[in-house]
């Protein structure tokens, strides 16, 4: 079951409050390992699910961005596991823009379970044309920055 809303919350201690998008994910049995906890590799996938839902919600879906001739691959990702989660846990995945230039976008994620932070991370994306060459998003798709919360 997936659903989302958008309160304003800080993403990491010391960060400014920003428009926070919240995506919810219920942990499936197949996402757990032999020890009964959510396998660590799933957190990167949860980040992607939340990012795609967030882009859809702000009107800048990957399909729309790609129709403008822009691709945005992940060029970096990092995370910290703070607590385990298990089958049937309901996760709240908070998404927030950490920083942006014309060529890169850094997105922060905080994953909570029952109000407790269980994971913090970020993904870094660049902007390329369809031939894989760097491009300035402000020149190719200027409304993208305006759509960001």
What do the PLM-derived regions correspond to, one by one?
Residues 3-6, 12-56:
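Catalytic strand-loop segment that frames the active site of acyl-thioester-processing enzymes
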Residues 3-4, 12, 20-23, 56, ...:
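HotDog/MaoC-like acyl-thioester-processing domains
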Residues 25-29, 81, 127:
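Hydrophobic residues in beta-strands and at strand termini
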Residues 43-46, 73, 108, 124:
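Residue-level recognition of specific faces of alpha-helices
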Residues 54-100, 104-105, 126:
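Hydrophobic beta-strand-centered segment that forms part of the acyl-chain substrate-binding groove
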């Amino acid at each position: 079951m997936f659903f989302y809303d958008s309160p304003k919350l800080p993403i990491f201690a010391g960060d400014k409050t920003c428009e926070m998008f919240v995506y919810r994910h219920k942990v499936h049995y197949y996402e757990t390992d032999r020890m009964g906890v959510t396998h660590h590799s799933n957190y990167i996938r949860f980040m992607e699910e939340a990012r795609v839902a967030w882009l859809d919600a702000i009107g800048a879906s990957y399909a729309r961005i790609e129709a403008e001739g822009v691709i945005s691959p992940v060029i970096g990702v990092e995370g910290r596991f703070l607590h385990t989660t298990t089958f049937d846990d309901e996760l709240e995945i908070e998404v927030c823009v950490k920083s942006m230039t014309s060529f890169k976008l850094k997105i922060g994620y905080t994953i909570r379970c029952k109000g407790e932070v269980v994971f913090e991370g970020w993904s870094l994306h660049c902007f390329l044309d369809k031939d894989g060459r760097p491009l300035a998003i402000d020149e190719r798709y200027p409304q993208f920055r305006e759509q960001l919360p």
